[in-house]
Amino acid sequence: MKFKFLLAFIPVLLFSQHLSAAEDGHNISVYTGTFDVIDKEGDDQTTLIGIEHKNKDLFRDTWIGRFSPTTGAFITGKSSVYIYTGIEADYNLGPINISPSFAPGYYEAGDGKNLGSALEFKSEIKIGIDLFKNANLGYSYSHISNNDWGDVNPGTDNQSITFSKKF
């Protein structure tokens, strides 16, 4: 019940700021999609919904791109939870944004897929387009696995649609 209450206020949070907020460094993303999109057995695929925060004020410019920290979490339709923090690169090609990321995190299977370990690693690629100066709509594809450090390592591939807003 509390989860549904929280979801009801996400749109308020996203659209309550003035459009000139694009100069600020905080970026909040909400996303929804499919967990275990390449499920060969057909019994673990489910929906996922998540939220992610990026603080662009903490970026580092390097010779291979601009990097900033990212923190987020998602829950699946089978009560699996993944909480993560990592690093994301940003490559802006006009209105198109490409953002690869890597994040270790804590995974709890709930009634969903057993990934073999509580420590799981998420690698992701996002491709988005700027809707306004401070809003972006994108597609992301991620892979989560434990690098064979767990009892088993089935991994999972996920895809989602992401809406991001700068505050």
In which residue ranges do the predicted regions lie?
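Short loop/turn motifs that connect adjacent beta-strands in outer-membrane beta-barrel proteins
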Residues: 19-25, 41, 56-67, 92-98, ...
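Outer-membrane beta-barrel "beta-signal"
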Residues: 47-51, 129, 154-167
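Transmembrane beta-strand segments that form the barrel wall of outer-membrane beta-barrel proteins
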Residues: 28-36, 64-76, 99-108, 140-145
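Cleavable N-terminal export/targeting peptides
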Residues: 1-25
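Solvent-exposed loop/turn segments connecting transmembrane beta-strands
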Residues: 37-47, 73-84, 111-118, 148-156
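Residue-level signature of outer-membrane beta-barrel architecture
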Residues: 53-57, 89-91, 129, 143, ...
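Membrane-embedded beta-strands that build the outer-membrane beta-barrel scaffold
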Residues: 51, 87, 98, 125-127, ...
